[in-house]
Amino acid sequence: MSRADDDAVGVPPTCGGRSDEEERRIVPGPNPQDGAKDGAKATAVPREPDEAALAAMSNQELLALGGKLDGVRIAYKEPRWPVEGTKAEKRAERSVAVWLLLGGVFGLALLLIFLFWPWEFKAADGESDFIYSLTTPLYGLTFGLSILSIAIGAVLYQKRFIPEEISIQERHDGASREIDRKTVVANLTDAFEGSTIRRRKLIGLSFGVGMGAFGLGTLVAFAGGLIKNPWKPVVPTAEGKKAVLWTSGWTPRYQGETIYLARATGTEDGPPFIKMRPEDIDAGGMETVFPWRESDGDGTTVESHHKLQEIAMGIRNPVMLIRIKPSDLGRVVKRKGQESFNFGEFFAFTKVCSHLGCPSSLYEQQSYRILCPCHQSQFDALHFAKPIFGPAARALAQLPITIDTDGYLVANGDFVEPVGPAFWERTTT
């Protein structure tokens, strides 16, 4: 090949005095120590081959041409293992494979834990409660260890097998052309061949197992919540089993069941909940109450402790019991069809915001406004908890209440609409 042909494909002439090994490792480029004339010739754009010549070029010729077109000078390039098949190389290969396989093991563990580990809430009773409490930490632990193991394997592979290379590129502007795309592909192909991944079957298999198990576990964990049937009837009620979204702790389990409005004491010395009387709350005041039944007990037995914990943990259970001042009763506007839901001055509204289910737990006594601190929705307790500000579009669900023969406040039935934010199947507005 002539000197002109060398310039056409960007292959520099052989430098005298260097061995074949040096010639393979060092590809000369523009040398700043040369004279201005030599530097100008070195940085000049090489003559581009036509389409026929471009199609006939080998990958190495395209690689050299791509570097010259991009102003890239390879200052140093050396394979990690000049001699193939040594014991040290095989040890390095096995260490990478171990990390990739560990990623697969942890990914498979994530999948199995997500599918078979007890995930439903269990009241505190020692071993079963401890197993349930590990669910979320195990999700995070197996997911994190899987991706960490794969990342360590990838880093080790780069450090131990990808050829060590130092390249210097001049900064330049310009849009990509067909010749640039072809030479980039040549560079990528050279990088793939130089990585020696093609002949490392153990690492390739380990990487496939690791990424496959990790991807499958992650996909199942992500899609698991999307394929759950929310309408499966699992909650026993007086009207038969219903789906969770249609029920709350205030839903009677049988006809005529008495459900008390109970205050949480927050102490361990006495019972966790005590029944409320009208005189227990001042005019204009608000109290958070929970559904309590006589069968729930006082927490002195294991069964009672379980039931009371379920009351406290139930997301639809908290209710705001508000006592309107006698002077403000004339300003009260009741919702159509719910005129009998209050007991005199006492009104009970769910504490679950109708926007996104946040706890609307702030109450302004002077204006009777209920505030959700998460997204700033405000509800007017004098106007059947109708939203007056913020993103909430529906009134808070109202619980019908009355008083029993012993003077305790009790629920006079269940909520007549689902508690909390909207979903497609609800018909109430």
UniProtKB/Swiss-Prot annotation:
Binds 1 [2Fe-2S] cluster per subunit. Its main location: membrane. Disulfide bonds join C358-C374. Keywords: 2Fe-2S, Cell membrane, Disulfide bond, Electron transport, Iron, Iron-sulfur, Membrane, Metal-binding, Oxidoreductase, Respiratory chain, Transmembrane, Transmembrane helix, Transport. [2Fe-2S] cluster binds at C353, H355, C372, H375. It is found in: Cell membrane. The keyword Cell membrane applies. Signal peptide: none annotated. The keyword Membrane applies. GO terms for molecular function: 2 iron, 2 sulfur cluster binding; metal ion binding; monooxygenase activity; oxidoreductase activity, acting on paired donors, with incorporation or reduction of molecular oxygen. Residues 316-410 form the Rieske domain. GO terms for cellular component: plasma membrane. This is Cytochrome bc1 complex Rieske iron-sulfur subunit. Its cofactor is [2Fe-2S] cluster. Belongs to the Rieske iron-sulfur protein family.
